[in-house]
């Protein structure tokens, strides 16, 4: 029951947004596949994602499916061949789902590694204390060959609920299937910066919900920081094996010290007003909880809401060491964040030491209204080697690349939709994509097809069906 109710809660948030003035409307007829592609300006690669059809898809730039695995990942993760002794095309996914209709996300029995041909080369789940993996929201292969998983457990959380509730636990699992390290969100409730008012509202929310959320803070991201310039300069908070997480429900981003388990860095959940701080050679000012669509950078981070995919940009990529995050502006927070009328999401690149925004993307940067780019839940953003950013506007299944100036140079709409029963017990057609991963050409077998033909979009005002 926990698995189903958790996903129902996740998807009902989206339904609430759709039924209020906080959301854009999606047309009933729209093109799918690649709709924009400029090979000269785009970073050319494959893209990996799982879709509501239950499969994991690998596409080329022209939107052709070049490979498929008949397993779902939340998210799927393709491994660098350096992590697989040179074998190409291995992915981490959920192998066996739970019995409930939505069990594949919160109640899965096993996760594992598949090779290019779909053969299982590593699996884990039956060895877990509950006999099930229950992995959700993130999975990562570590440099030592172990695997880091974000899972769901039930237990009372001090100061939140005396009854057992669904909490989230990070586990590190060895190649042999042994748990060698754990960290549980509920054990650190006093370190997340939740105000007394927020703590009271959090307790009331769990009393009203009968403790059936799928993870009471909805930690949706869990990534090792990796090598970075801050640690190299002596800042131990950014040790490479420390872990960055973010909470969708409480709107904070934090770093876990791997050695002590303590939170050693945090952004949010509540943002001060009128602060000034020096970022580099410029003075950055946070003038209010939002101006939501201020284009001035650098400036201090203003209020985020329901963000996803917070991570440190890896070494070797442009702006390495900065934090990149998809700020959804979805309903979130204890107390709830006051959202803007002109709903729109943002991609924020943040200097984690000064907490200043040094680059951002909104729909406005693509000469669209703010609401032209919006996903109230799920979604991701990844920096590419040429400086572009790959964005997953998850709610609408739209994947696209933008340049630093905001020009859209590649766009793809997920065609792999399915009818699903949501909170109202009615079937709806959904094509959402939780996360998208750019895949270098040399990560897959050499004979994998690849097409790079330019696609010029039509003039929308003259594009009609007959």
Where are these regions (language model features)?
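Bacterial N-terminal signal peptides
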Residues: 8-18
């Amino acid at each position: 029951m926990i698995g189903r109710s958790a996903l129902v809660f996740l998807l009902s948030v989206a339904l609430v947004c759709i039924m209020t003035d906080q959301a854009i409307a999606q047309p009933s007829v729209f093109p799918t596949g690649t709709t924009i592609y400029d090979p000269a300006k785009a970073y050319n690669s494959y893209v990996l994602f799982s879709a509501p059809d239950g499969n994991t898809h690998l596409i080329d730039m022209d939107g052709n499916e070049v490979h498929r695995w008949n397993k779902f990942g939340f998210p799927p993760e393709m491994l660098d061949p350096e992590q697989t002794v040179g074998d190409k095309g291995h992915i981490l996914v959920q192998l066996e789902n739970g019995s409930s209709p939505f069990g594949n996300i919160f109640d899965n029995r096993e996760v594992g590694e598949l090779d290019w041909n779909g053969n299982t080369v590593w699996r884990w789940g039956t060895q877990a204390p509950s006999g099930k993996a229950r992995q959700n929201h993130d999975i990562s292969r570590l440099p030592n060959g172990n695997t880091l998983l974000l899972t769901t457990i039930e237990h009372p959380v001090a100061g939140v609920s005396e009854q057992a509730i669904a909490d989230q636990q990070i586990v590190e699992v060895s190649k042999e299937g042994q748990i060698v390290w754990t960290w549980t969100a509920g054990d650190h409730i006093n370190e997340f910066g939740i105000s007394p008012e927020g703590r009271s509202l959090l307790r009331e929310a769990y009393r009203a919900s009968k403790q059936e959320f799928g993870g009471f803070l909805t930690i949706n991201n869990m990534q090792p920081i990796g090598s970075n310039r801050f640690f190299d300069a002596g800042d131990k908070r950014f040790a490479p094996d420390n872990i960055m997480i973010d909470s969708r429900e409480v709107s904070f981003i934090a770093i876990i010290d791997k050695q002590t388990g303590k939170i050693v860095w945090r952004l949010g959940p509540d943002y001060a007003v009128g602060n000034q701080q020096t970022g580099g050679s410029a003075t950055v000012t946070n003038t209010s909880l939002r101006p939501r669509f201020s284009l001035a950078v650098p400036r201090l981070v203003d209020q985020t809401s329901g963000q996803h995919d917070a991570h440190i940009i890896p070494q070797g990529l442009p702006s390495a060491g900065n934090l990149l995050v998809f700020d959804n502006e979805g309903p979130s927070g204890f107390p709830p964040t006051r959202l803007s009328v002109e709903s729109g999401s943002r991609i924020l690149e943040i200097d984690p030491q000064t907490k200043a925004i040094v680059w951002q993307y909104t729909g406005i940067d693509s000469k669209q209204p703010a609401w032209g780019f919006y996903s109230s839940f799920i979604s991701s953003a990844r920096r590419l080697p040429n400086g572009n950013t790959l964005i997953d506007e998850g709610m609408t299944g739209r994947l696209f690349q933008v340049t630093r100036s905001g020009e859209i140079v590649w766009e793809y709409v997920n065609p792999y939709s399915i009818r699903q029963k949501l909170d109202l017990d009615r079937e709806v057609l959904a094509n959402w994509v939780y996360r998208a991963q750019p895949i270098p050409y040399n990560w897959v077998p050499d004979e994998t097809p690849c097409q790079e033909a330019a696609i010029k979009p039509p003039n929308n005002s003259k594009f009609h069906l007959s």
